[in-house]
């Protein structure tokens, strides 16, 4: 190290003798490490990454090689002020050490050796107020902090956890979609033989909010086709994603996490934090400053900020990404009582990779789970390997996040005071409801991105007992007016070919009610007459027995936008 100092002095990096002598003394003192919250000097995956970040910044600011930077950092008696929260870090390490997450490897290489000893995981937690990284999980089992840090170094395909970042964020900001926009979730040919599938059954006509709740793939690809992968990549880069290939990743699969290189938990956490922080991306940091032995600050962490989307669209994105934690969603077990919780699951083919990314007003966290060798899946045949019956990444996320929120005041995100408006929306088309729309709900929009009025609706009177067109004999209290038809604007685009288009729940009904007939009405009239003799009474008894319907046909159900009539999805799925 002393030799390095001499070289630095020769190159003019140390300008005078006093500075040189002070540096020599610091070398003899050695490197000191201070936690920003506790002052402890224990070594963790967070600590290891902190030192790497300091070395990287020294290289950039002093324009020196990595070797020179390492020697300067390790041998100059520096004190590094870390952002680690010791309590949060300890909770991560405690959960990562549990054996239930260590699913043994099964596949062997040509030498008969296991490709993987057991599953692994990586996790990063960010404090939303400061955008400081407070904890890192780098491996399952024994904490080998000098090894590969899966929280910061691993890059893997993200699956559906990419949807809020690649589709919703840019889609809202570019006014391609709203929360109410409807697509036909049916098998679709996007060209070049690309026909993605859903992990669960296609839902037919479905809006964006519901798509995220149950993690439908096909509508998200349709969003990407109109938005374009190029535009999506622009936004992803603004959110701190550095591993994208402008050529290889510029395809529709980007919409559902199909990537050439993948993304690290650190960068996923940083990107999600931009949604939590009202649409502003702030680079996550591991240290705040570095001082020398004399107390002089020699390095301050770089923390650049970038406005990605408007405050209003960030609010809407949070609202949409909270759907998976609600009834019928894929991450209901991640909901934190008293906290507004947003969470999105992610899975790749055969569950090779499992993800859970999400946030509360306090923290943002991203967790990956899988095997180091990405050729070994977590789904074999009909068997899906899980932890406690859940997505293992989601179980890690849920257990840790719920614990670190204990004792914190209940909190929701702030709603912008301006720039938002509520409208009554037609559930069948996603347009602003008109007098012809009978199936409606209320949705929130930015003032510059409100849907057009619903078009193409007609109305007809339906018998609620038969579910068919009411005839002249249907009782008035059994007749209701419903809308039919309606234009789905996005499905008029010529950007894809929807195969076997879904049948709309609002299609016109042609069959006429056969339950209520003239004969029954005459019978009813007879019932209202006062019998004049015993024979007439007995005739009425017989008539009632023979003519009264024995069962009441089930009333037609109109799918509820909130998804309450949908079967809750198996939580082991995406």
Indicate where each model-derived feature is located:
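Intrinsically disordered, low-complexity repeat and linker tracts
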Residues: 299-301, 423, 460-465, 479-482, ...
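Short active-site loop at a secondary-structure junction
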Residues: 119-120, 144-165, 174, 179-182, ...
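Conserved catalytic neighborhood of penicillin-recognizing serine enzymes
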Residues: 36-39, 176-232, 251, 281, ...
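Mid-domain, small-residue-enriched loop/turn segments at the edges of structured enzyme/sensor domains
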Residues: 194-197, 228-270
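Second-shell loop/turn segments in exported
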Residues: 4-5, 9, 33-39, 75-83, ...
């Amino acid at each position: 190290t002393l030799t390095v100092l001499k070289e630095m002095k020769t190159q003019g990096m140390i300008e005078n003798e006093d500075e040189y002598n002070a540096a020599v003394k610091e070398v003899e003192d050695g490197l000191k490490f201070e936690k920003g919250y506790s002052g402890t000097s224990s070594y963790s995956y967070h600590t290891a990454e902190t030192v790497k970040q300091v070395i990287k910044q020294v290289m950039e600011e002093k324009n020196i090689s990595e070797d020179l930077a390492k020697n300067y950092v390790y041998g100059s008696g520096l004190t590094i002020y870390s952002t680690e929260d010791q309590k949060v870090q300890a909770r991560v390490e405690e959960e990562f050490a549990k054996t239930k997450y260590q699913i043994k490897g099964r596949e062997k290489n040509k030498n008969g050796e296991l490709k993987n000893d057991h599953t692994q995981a990586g996790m990063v937690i960010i404090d939303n107020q400061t955008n400081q990284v407070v904890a890192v999980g780098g491996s399952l089992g024994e904490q080998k902090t000098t090894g590969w840090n899966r929280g910061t170094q691993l890059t893997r395909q993200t699956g559906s956890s990419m949807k809020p970042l690649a589709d919703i964020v840019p889609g809202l900001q570019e006014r391609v979609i709203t929360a109410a926009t409807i697509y036909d979730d049916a098998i679709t040919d996007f060209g070049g033989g690309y026909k993605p599938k859903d992990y669960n059954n296609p839902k037919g006509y479905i809006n964006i909010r519901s798509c995220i709740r149950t993690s439908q793939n096909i509508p998200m690809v349709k969003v990407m086709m109109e938005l374009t992968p190029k535009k999506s990549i622009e936004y992803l880069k603004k959110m701190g994603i550095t591993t994208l290939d402008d050529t290889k990743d510029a395809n529709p699969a980007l919409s559902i996490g199909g990537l050439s290189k993948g993304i690290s938990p650190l960068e996923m956490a940083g990107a999600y934090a931009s949604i939590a922080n009202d649409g502003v991306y702030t680079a996550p940091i591991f240290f705040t400053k570095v001082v020398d032995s004399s107390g002089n600050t020699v390095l301050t962490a770089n923390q650049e900020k970038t406005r990605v989307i408007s405050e209003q669209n960030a609010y809407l994105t949070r609202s949409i990404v909270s759907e998976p934690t609600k009834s019928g969603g894929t991450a209901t077990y991640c909901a934190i009582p008293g906290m507004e919780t947003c969470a999105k699951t992610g899975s790749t083919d055969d569950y090779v990779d499992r993800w859970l990314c999400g946030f509360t007003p306090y923290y943002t966290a991203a967790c990956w789970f899988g095997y180091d060798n990405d050729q070994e899946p977590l789904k074999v045949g009909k068997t899906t390997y899980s932890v406690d019956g859940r997505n293992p990444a989601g179980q890690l996320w849920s257990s840790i996040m719920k614990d670190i929120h204990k004792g914190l005041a209940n909190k929701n995100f702030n709603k912008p005071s301006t720039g938002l408006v509520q409208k009554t929306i037609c559930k069948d088309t996603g347009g602003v409801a008109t007098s012809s729309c009978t199936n409606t709900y209320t949705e929130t929009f930015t003032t510059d991105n409100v849907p057009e009025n619903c078009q193409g609706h007609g109305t007809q009177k339906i018998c609620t007992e038969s579910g068919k067109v009411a005839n002249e004999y249907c009782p008035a209290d059994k007749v209701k007016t419903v809308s039919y038809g309606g234009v789905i604007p996005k499905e008029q685009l010529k950007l894809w070919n929807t195969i076997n288009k879904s049948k709309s729940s609002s299609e016109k009904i042609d069959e006429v009610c056969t339950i209520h007939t003239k004969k029954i009405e005459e019978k009813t009239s007879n019932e209202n007459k006062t019998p004049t003799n015993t024979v007439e009474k007995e005739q009425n008894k017989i008539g009632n027995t023979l003519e009264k319907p024995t069962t009441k046909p089930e009333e037609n159900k109109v799918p509820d936008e909130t998804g309450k009539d949908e079967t809750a999805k198996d939580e082991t799925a995406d």
